[in-house]
């Protein structure tokens, strides 16, 4: 490892104002949402199922935070400050999705659809916090770049699912527009941090390539039933338009500093059923 490999910041100063983000955090959305159209026609079963899956993904924040904060990421004040508000906003996105289900008269929980997938490529992501902390100790501070980049890619994947939901059910467009407006700031921060940190360090690039090729997509789906993950992939990325969206995300991944087309292709293959 060289000194340049161990840098934690790029030369460019960050532009995203984390304090302003915290000051203007968006909480409950129930009073903002006009769901009157939901009373006129029932939600399609596939739309209701995807809403429940997305709600569970938004709720998975605490498990993800636990995994991140046993690594060097917890020492990065800028990232941890962002994560605090990010978790708060995701909690209220999940609450808004519950409100949609309640208004539509839909069950809040999906039926038990079986066991999670057990993929060899995802085995490292199933480590407990102790093993994760030990492994992260060897990776050092450059692992922060891998975490923010994986978070960015995850936001791209989940945002694609929301857009698919909007295209499938017109009555949900106001909900999706609101959610995507909240997520736009998450994406802006993560994109800026990924670009800065990857540009600064070849070692960060190597760690990030490894992280992206072994992560489940979306990240919070690791313990989801296999049938729910298959449904998500098929409904969001199984159509010609969905495959084009997966290809677009793969292109964005490939264009990140030091990541390349190989990782983009691997991601595309994981998304498309």
Q: Residues of each region from the PLM?
A:
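Non-heme di-metal
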Residues: 2-273
């Amino acid at each position: 490892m060289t000194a340049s490999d161990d840098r934690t910041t790029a030369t460019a100063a960050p532009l995203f104002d984390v304090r302003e983000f915290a000051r203007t955090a968006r909480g409950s959305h129930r009073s903002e949402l006009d769901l009157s159209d939901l009373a006129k026609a029932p939600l399609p079963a596939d739309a209701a199922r995807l809403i429940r899956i997305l709600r569970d993904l938004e709720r998975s924040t605490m498990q993800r935070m636990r995994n991140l904060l046993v690594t060097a990421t917890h020492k990065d004040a800028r990232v941890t400050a962002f994560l605090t508000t990010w978790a708060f906003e995701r909690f209220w996105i999940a609450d808004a999705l519950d409100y949609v289900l309640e208004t539509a008269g839909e069950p809040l929980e999906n039926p038990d659809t079986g066991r999670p997938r057990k993929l060899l490529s995802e085995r490292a992501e199933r480590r407990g916090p102790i093993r994760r902390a030990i492994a992260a100790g060897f990776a050092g501070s450059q692992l922060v770049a891998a975490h923010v980049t994986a978070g960015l890619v995850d936001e791209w994947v989940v945002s694609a699912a929301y857009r698919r939901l909007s295209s499938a059910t017109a009555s949900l467009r106001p909900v999706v527009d609101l959610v995507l407006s909240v997520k736009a700031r998450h994406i802006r921060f993560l994109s800026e941090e990924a670009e800065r940190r990857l540009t600064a360090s070849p070692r960060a690039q190597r760690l990030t390539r490894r992280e992206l090729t072994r992560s489940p997509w979306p990240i919070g789906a690791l313990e989801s039933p296999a049938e729910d993950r298959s449904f998500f992939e098929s409904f969001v990325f199984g159509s010609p338009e969905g495959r084009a969206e997966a290809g677009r995300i793969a292109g964005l991944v490939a264009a990140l500093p030091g990541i390349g087309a190989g990782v983009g292709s691997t991601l595309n293959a994981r998304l498309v059923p």
